[in-house]
């Protein structure tokens, strides 16, 4: 099955756990999720405990959870605080218990920096409550990416001189330094664009995505069913550009399709798609048709990536759960709009040609304009990319983050194929 990430599962009825892993390898913040398929147990509280047997004495955590509540029925651990190697995870739920073997593999300069910082700040190994930006020392300038340093233009000169940034990307990267975004025209292969558009049309017509015709709804998790969306998340040209920008390998965490403009208010992505160290996430948006005036075009506020970043601890509100966003809208979104109003920056309406790639900084203020002509579509898709070696979490909801494995085998069966095979077996 193709999913957000491959899940290495340990199962002991009536409970099972899912671990964020790829073929048994774990990195960053590792989430261990307790689930049950027994309807009678889904809303029944149980003591859930996790222990890492090879870790220092006392490396365990316990919490009381309700398996049917996905937002709270998990325990996570910072794998950066462990040496790379194989570990045994012992878990228990009520009278049930089992073990899972995983391999911790945090590699690269960024991972080493994060590990050192977590040890220095005595960040706990286990998390049993919400993930929050207050856990990490985001004010350490040494941890920021090169493009967020005061001498970023001089650093770009060095990267160009040493060949770590090709000359053809210089103007794009300088615009990123000054304005927080850049565009590369004719980026996406025309054949892939046709496949992406066909997939969205099919999803909208069949209702598979829950899309309501004419609405501004997003098409989520399309890569699970449609190969074209899987391909765009691992598109080599996009990966190369973002890896070069970050100066470290990156991985996409999601892909979203759009048939129409979102009409979304100005916002920063970092509160939803969060990373430590800050700065190591960016959006990659691709136009799947020529964007027309009045279609609900993207709106960008150039230079807003240098504005204050609003996180949940700054807003002083509870994490969002069960899709209850009203408090978030009344606090965080109000603060975003205040930043826009106080800046005096004129919004830029973005009307790209088909196949153009737009890359933006995690702090860039952007949104969707009003759809003045509802007959016009604005077909596009977006992926968000994290640098490998960082800690991925979602500050708005307090959940550990996940990624789409860039090197995963593409011969994995789709859900549709699995359903067909099951039907054939049952029909025999």
Where are the predicted features?
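Double-stranded beta-helix
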Residues: 294-365
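Surface-exposed, short loops/turns at beta-strand junctions within beta-sandwich domains
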Residues: 79-85
């Amino acid at each position: 099955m193709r999913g957000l990430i491959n899940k290495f599962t340990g199962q002991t009825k009536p409970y099972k756990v899912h671990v964020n892993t790829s073929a048994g390898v774990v990195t960053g913040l590792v989430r261990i999720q307790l689930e049950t398929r027994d309807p009678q147990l889904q809303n029944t509280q149980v003591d859930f405990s996790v222990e890492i047997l090879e870790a220092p004495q006392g490396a365990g955590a316990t919490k009381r959870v309700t398996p049917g509540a996905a937002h709270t029925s998990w325990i996570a651990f910072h794998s950066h605080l462990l040496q790379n190697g194989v570990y045994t995870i012992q878990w228990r739920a009520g009278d049930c218990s089992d073990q899972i073997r995983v391999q911790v593999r945090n590699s690269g300069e960024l991972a080493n920096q994060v590990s050192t910082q977590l040890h220095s700040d005595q960040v706990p190994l286990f998390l049993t409550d919400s993930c929050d930006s207050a856990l990490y020392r985001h004010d350490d300038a040494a941890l920021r990416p090169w493009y967020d340093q005061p001498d970023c233009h001089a650093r770009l000169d060095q990267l160009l001189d040493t060949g770590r940034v090709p000359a053809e990307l210089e103007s794009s990267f300088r615009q990123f330094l000054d304005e927080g975004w850049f565009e590369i025209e004719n980026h996406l292969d025309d054949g892939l664009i046709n496949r992406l558009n066909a997939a969205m049309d099919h999803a909208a017509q069949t209702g598979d995505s829950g899309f309501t015709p004419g609405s501004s709804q997003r098409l989520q998790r399309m890569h699970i069913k449609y190969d074209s969306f899987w391909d765009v998340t691992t598109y080599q040209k996009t990966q190369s550009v973002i890896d070069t920008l970050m100066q470290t390998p990156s991985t996409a965490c999601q892909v979203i399709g759009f048939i129409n403009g979102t009409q979304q208010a100005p916002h920063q992505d970092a509160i939803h798609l969060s990373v430590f160290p800050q700065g190591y996430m960016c959006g990659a948006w691709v136009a799947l048709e020529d964007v027309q005036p009045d279609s609900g075009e993207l709106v960008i506020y150039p230079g807003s990536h240098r504005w204050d970043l609003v996180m949940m601890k700054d807003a002083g509100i509870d994490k969002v759960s069960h899709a209850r966003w009203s408090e978030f809208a009344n606090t965080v979104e109000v603060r975003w709009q205040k930043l826009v109003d106080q800046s005096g920056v004129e919004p830029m309406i973005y009307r790209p040609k088909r196949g153009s790639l737009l890359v933006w900084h995690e702090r860039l203020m952007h949104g969707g304009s009003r759809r003045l002509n509802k007959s016009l579509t604005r077909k596009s898709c977006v992926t968000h990319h994290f640098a490998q070696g960082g800690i991925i979490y979602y500050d708005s909801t307090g959940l550990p983050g996940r990624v789409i494995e860039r090197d995963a085998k593409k011969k994995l069966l789709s859900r549709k194929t699995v359903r067909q095979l099951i039907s054939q077996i049952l029909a025999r």
